[in-house]
Design a protein with these regions (language model features):
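Short, Lys/Arg-enriched N-terminal segments with co-localized hydrophobic residues
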Residues: 1-12
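N-terminal module-boundary/linker segments of secreted carbohydrate-active enzymes
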Residues: 39-85, 92-93
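Bacterial N-terminal signal peptides
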Residues: 24-33
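Conserved, well-ordered alpha-helix/loop/beta-strand core segments that scaffold catalytic motifs
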Residues: 337-351, 356-357
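Chitinase-like catalytic core of GlcNAc-active glycosidases
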Residues: 70-98, 103-251
């Protein structure tokens, strides 16, 4: 068994002269280290953070945001501009933004096939004069199967509940993104029942982005378009958290989606979804579950020298270097993408979600009825500055 270092020192230092010499050497080394450190620190150069030039942007937590590319030209106006508002994030919603439609998110389905968290139309306030659509979601593949397959006896209850909840709304949007492939026919008949019960109120259905027709696609644009009044294409998440880093919605990818969609239905059948958010990726992920040997090996490989205990339970810390890559959207990228959609003949866009945006976007994006909102930028900046003051 290896003898601890402190025990070795204690056994070797048996005579007083050796101990005295050893102590003197330690003091001398410590003084030398302090002098060297002080000298190094004394002449350490001072660097200042400056704004990077040559078209490279250095983002900072300051407002207004600094662009490396200025927006120019005319504002982009659409027939319809939708914005999604989460019922749990109402404070992020500004009812003065130039929207024609609000998607209120969301009426959920629980494990028993019951509607829960059904929002009220009044949540968006009385200032907004546009249309408000109830959005319904089901965030589980197995639960989606359970809810839309008639043999389980819950589908009728869900349809009835949604039709009752939508009475105070202007329309219903189905955002069920995890329908199993074998449930395609059940999904279409589910949509037909909803459409029949809605009467003159519009039914919109959210579908993932497609650049071509897929075999046995449960989200077939052609089949869903025969039932729904409108199709909302979620033209984002080209790259997601679990995959390689990249744009949330690159321009080339979005152009392919826009070109394909028109081969199935006319442009006025669609609402094109745009992202307000971004994502960050790292080249390393340290989260994992390990056996004792793995924990021990990891500590050794990362030069852990101290094991601490909390009421007997061991734990340690070490630092690793991570390369980070972030992709996001600002007013410039959103305006460019919106112009592309409009140029291709699309008249309706939607944003996921309100409160995540670069507020300058509302100087450039608007609807043909009310135009853009030049005051929104200043309103947003003021609100953000007030939040910063509260923190300080």
């Amino acid at each position: 068994m290896e003898i601890p270092l402190n025990r070795q020192i204690g056994e070797n230092m048996t005579n007083k002269s050796f101990a005295t010499k050893f102590l003197g050497m330690c003091i001398l080394l410590a003084l030398c280290s302090v002098c060297v450190f002080a000298e190094a620190k004394k002449y350490e150069p001072v660097t200042e953070k400056t704004i990077t030039e040559d078209g490279v942007m250095l983002p900072g937590y300051t407002y207004p945001y600094k662009w490396n590319s200025e927006i120019s030209g005319d504002p982009v106006l659409f027939e319809e501009v939708w914005g999604y508002v989460m019922i749990s994030r109402l404070k992020d919603y500004d009812d003065e933004t130039p929207l024609t439609d609000v998607g209120l998110f969301a009426a959920e389905v629980n494990s028993y096939g019951e509607l829960t968290n059904v929002p009220k139309r009044s949540a968006v306030g009385t200032k907004f004069k546009g249309r408000v659509h109830l959005v319904t979601i089901c965030e589980s593949t197995s639960l989606s199967h359970f809810c839309i397959d008639p043999k389980y006896g819950v589908r009728d209850k869900i349809v009835e509940g949604l039709l009752e909840a939508v009475e105070e709304f202007d329309g219903l949007q189905v955002d069920w993104e995890l329908i199993p492939g074998r449930d395609a026919d059940n999904f279409y008949s589910f949509l037909k029942e909803l459409k029949k019960g809605l009467g003159k109120k519009p039914l919109t259905v959210c579908v993932p982005a497609r650049t071509k027709t897929l075999n046995q696609d449960v989200y077939s644009y052609e089949k869903i378009g025969k039932i729904a009044d409108r199709i909302m294409i979620m033209a984002y998440d080209e790259h997601w958290t679990g995959g390689p880093a990249g744009s949330i919605a690159s321009m080339d990818w979005c152009e392919k989606i826009a070109d394909y969609a028109k081969t199935v239905w006319p442009a006025n059948k669609y609402i094109f979804g745009l992202p307000f958010y971004g994502r960050i990726w790292g080249n390393k992920s340290v989260k994992q579950a390990l056996a004792f040997n793995g924990m021990n090996r990891t500590a050794h490989e990362n030069n852990v020298v101290t094991i601490e205990r909390e009421r007997g339970v061991p734990h340690y810390n070490y630092t690793v270097s991570v390369d980070v890559e972030g992709w996001y959207e600002d007013a410039y990228s959103i305006v460019e993408r919106s112009r592309m959609y409009k140029k291709k003949g699309y008249k309706c866009i939607a944003f996921w979600r309100m409160g995540q945006e670069d507020v300058a976007v509302w100087d450039w994006i608007g609807n043909k009825k009310t135009g853009t909102d030049p005051l929104t930028v200043q309103i947003g900046i003021k609100a953000l500055e007030e939040k910063e003051e509260e923190k300080n």
